[in-house]
Amino acid sequence: MYKDYKESHENYLKAIYLISKKKKGGWVLNSEIAEFLKVKPSSVTEMLYKLKNEGFIIWRPRKSIHLTVKGKKVAQSILRKNKELKKFFKNILNLKDDLKLNEICCKIEHHITPEVRIALEHLNSTLV
């Protein structure tokens, strides 16, 4: 089921997911998220309250953060969209600037429905 989450929520969930993949146990610190997203720790704390209340994370204030199954699914979905968009821009439209590709895909990924992602996957697999 597709749910239109706020872009900021998705960015935080994606950041937590990517950071947690590099850590044993998957627990992430507020400061790591702040550094990853280049925001103030107080901004992270504010968002963590929202994510916790919406059931996306398990959070022990002043300790660490872990994604719930729900949070992990949203993060993985965003990353799949990003991956297919990059393939499309790189292989079909022949855009080569990785920095620009990252910037474009990070903006668009939040507006792609599951149906569009599936269509992109199909297009990418048939034309590449």
Residue ranges and their predicted role:
Residues K52-R62:
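A short, conserved structural fragment
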Residues K3-V39:
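N-terminal helix-turn-helix DNA-binding core of bacterial DNA-binding proteins
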Residues E103-V128:
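C-terminal regulatory/oligomerization modules of transcriptional regulators
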Residues L79-H111:
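Arg/Lys-rich, alpha-helical DNA-contact motif
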Residues K63-N82:
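Basic, amphipathic "hinge/linker" alpha-helix immediately C-terminal to the N-terminal HTH DNA-binding motif
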Residues I33, V44-E54:
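Basic amphipathic alpha-helical segments that dock to polyanions
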